[in-house]
Amino acid sequence: MNKQNIYWQLYQDDPILKPGFPSPVLADPSFLFPENCPDGHWHLFAHNIFGVQEFLSEDGIHWKKRKTVVWNAMRPFIFLEEGTYYLYYEKYKFLHVLMSWFPYRKWKSHIEVRTSKDLKSWSSPKTVITPKFPFHKDSKYGESVSNPCLVKFGEKYRMYFSSSLVFIPDCGFCEPKHITVAEASSPLGPFSYFSDPILSPNEMDPFCNLGAGSIKVIEWKGRYLGFQNGIFWNPVRKESCSAILFLQSEDGINFERINHTPILGPTGRGWKASHVYACDVKYSEKEKIFILYFNARNKAHWTQGKEAIGLFVGKVEESKTSGTKSTKQIKKPKQTIKKKISQAKPKVKKSKRK
């Protein structure tokens, strides 16, 4: 059997999308390839402090804001099936995201979905996930379900989502504590909840000892790949961090790490100095390239930090031997990212999958 080596590299050092005034953050991107959109453009959804924004691009690099799709919402995920677009997001009360930065304000959220046939007009919202189990809630910080990710499993649909909260002192706000699953026979639900998390923080885990963060899962070559941003304390830097961990699973429930260390983490300086957060990932079978949009933070505390969106690329190479580290540049994908992708930042992180 052939072995797949995945060579990960940043598209560029700088972000491709920055927050616009007055919001200090633009976060949690989810995107569609142009061939899957009626207008032939790339579409990307992300949130600022006011709600979920939609952006358009001709090349996947240069983006323009189209509109605010949902107010008082965050952490979107876009899913397409048979001509219908499903936009999932975490919904909260008016201005609650701003008030949550102050002490003694409990959080409360649920996950909604809206549908569209043309990415222009959207249906009324439908609630699909609410906090039900004890591990969805925290007596001190509130009730939270967030970071939806829908994957089709045969005739069923599996919703991965984050639940509950853990306070991160140097950030001054909470992050998701667990990751869990619900299943349904329709993208609109009703969903049956798993009674336990599938991923939780572990004090012995150097890259996930504070919170499980979020996960995006995709099916690839008969297995399921997971991209988790674990929340952890860095004892060397004496601060919290977040980094993207690369996982795999046979059943989509029991995950193991492909790489023992993160494939993408904070740099200690620049726009992604402190935290690399949630991402969205899609794979081009024709070009053998993973495209991963992520958001990152420059400073921990909410009064100082800003978040922007970057691009990470994984090129797949197959070999029948162990091989050596690739030095090849990524070639230009058709109908995806234009010529600069072949000039991606040369630093490479290698992943192996047998």
Regions found by a protein language model. Give the residues of each.
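Extracellular glycan/ECM-engagement signal in secreted proteins
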Residues: 279
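Intrinsically disordered, Lys/Arg-rich low-complexity segments
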Residues: 325-354
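Beta-rich carbohydrate-recognition and catalytic domains
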Residues: 1-146, 151-209, 218-274, 284-331
